[in-house]
Each structure stands twice: as C-alpha cells, then as structure tokens.
C-alpha cells in the first residue's frame, strides 16, 4: 500500500476561492486517492463544494480570517496566526502535513513561510522556482523574485536546490544546470555571475552537470533543464516568457478566426492547433515552489482555474514522493 501524502491547503487564497480550490481538490483526488487534504478556511463555504470527496480523505480546519490579495507582505503577516494561510503553514511546521499550498498573496506567503519554517542547514536564502516547458521536456527555473541581490554562494545553492527539485520531479533524467547571462562567453556578465561560473566549473558536481551560461533566447531549447538567476533577472525572464506566450496565442487565434480562409485553415489543422494550444496552456505548469526551507511550500497562481490548481496539487504529490527536502540536504553538504 502506498504512503498517504498529506497536503495542507489554504482554501481562501486567490480568485474564486474556496470553490476553485475545492473543485481542484476533487479533480486531483480522482487520480491521487492516496492523498489526505488538511483544508484551512471558512467551513460553511467549503462544505458547499466538497461533497464529491470521501470524508476519510480530508479534514476542514475552520477559520474566517484570511490574507487579502491587496495586503503588503507585512500586512498579510500582521493579520495574525489565525488566517487560513498561516494555519496551513503551521501544519507543515508541526509535521501534521508533508507540504503546504496556497493560491493567495505571494509576498505574504513567502514572509509567513520564513517566519514559521527553518532554513535547511547551510542554505542562506530560499528561492522561488517554477517549471517551464522546453523543446524536449521541462525546465526548473529559479530564482523568480524572492531575492533581488545574490552572492555566488546563493547562486550555487540555487543550482543545488534546482537540480534536486528537477530530480525529485524527473528521477530518470540527468539535471543539467546553466547560469542565465547576457552571453555565453566566460568574460560576459557581472562579477557575481563570473565568480559563480568559476566555482561551479571547479566544483565536483556529482548531483548535476554544469553547462555554463545560457542566454535568454536559449531558455526553451531544452539543452539544459535547470536555469539559475538572481531574483531580479529571473522575474523579468518569467514575465517576458508569459507575455510572449500570451501574445502568440492571441495573435494565432485572431489569424485563424479573422476570415473564411483562416477558419478553413484552422479546421484543417485542428489537431495540431489543439496540441500547440495545450503546450502553451499556463495551467499545465501551475505551481511555483519556494525551496530552501525545511518544508516545501507551493504557490499556485491566484488567477488560475480548478484545473490549474489541480495541477499544482500534482506538483505537491510528486515533490513529496520524490523526497525533495532529503535530496537537498544530501547534496548541499
């Protein structure tokens, strides 16, 4: 019998919650029946949507207090220890759950997580990471905004954590790490990135292959699968990629529906267009991972629907099954 995976869920964060959250749980449970959900939020509202789930697979911890999307990180933390977000994080701190997920305020989630959870030994800063599609499979990209300024040690830690995350999600593949830079030559970049390059090049990287630098126009090539940057650079890359994907899908839709020729072309290519649309569907890649703390914290996009939230729950399942925290501890020494 497989181990029961316990997920602490903030049911009140993000748009259209708790309905979206509970619908996502219902959808996730259909293919993950070895999951137990600790659900934090307004019990009366939650019970309106949870009738599809066996009562043995969940527990509702009632609270009407929540962190608002408009709160600053500090305001969110000051709302107190009875918010659904705080209580969910407290659950993993007390080892009542294996992992925590929220679609709520990102800044508040990071601050409350850091207030409650300890850093993994020998790691100075946590990082925000996410999954990106590439031509061959998927890539882990970090940091996406948790740390604006980073030292070479921070970037080396991110390389180790990112490769550990990749291996926990894709255990049969080799982690290949690259540093995001303005060029591929060794002389390019600032002093921090060049020093990081030198140290990674000289390090005995048994847990990953170091592939040097990668430029922004190569992120989706699939030649590497762990891309490391400081939070300032990484966040700009993330927003640029999201905007480009939205532009492409929007323009393609207009081209295919604008006139009779476009409509006929779209009908003739409906199978390929469907595959293309699915490849760019952000719901499939929903679920940013806050790593470096001694318990994993998952951030679902607040504007996603129940399918996107279900996919972020699947990321939770794979991370716990893949022993992410243990991998980081073993590799960071």
Curated annotation (Swiss-Prot):
Pathway in which this enzyme or protein is active? Lipid metabolism; phospholipid metabolism
Family, per the entry? Answer: Belongs to the PlsX family.
Kindly give the SUPFAM superfamilies that the UniProt entry links to this protein. Answer: Isocitrate/Isopropylmalate dehydrogenase-like (SSF53659)
Example GO biological process? fatty acid biosynthetic process
Keywords of the record: Cytoplasm, Lipid biosynthesis, Lipid metabolism, Phospholipid biosynthesis, Phospholipid metabolism, Transferase
Could you give the subunit structure recorded for this chain?
Homodimer. Probably interacts with PlsY.
* UniProt cross-references to InterPro entries, sorted A to Z: FA_synthesis, Phospholipid_synth_PlsX-like
GO MF annotation terms: phosphate:acyl-[acyl carrier protein] acyltransferase activity
Name the reaction it catalyses: a fatty acyl-[ACP] + phosphate = an acyl phosphate + holo-[ACP]
A Pfam family = FA_synthesis
Q: Which domain of life is it from?
A: Bacteria
How is this protein named in the record? Phosphate acyltransferase
Q: What is its EC number?
A: 2.3.1.274
The protein's organism comes out as Pelagibacter ubique (strain HTCC1062)
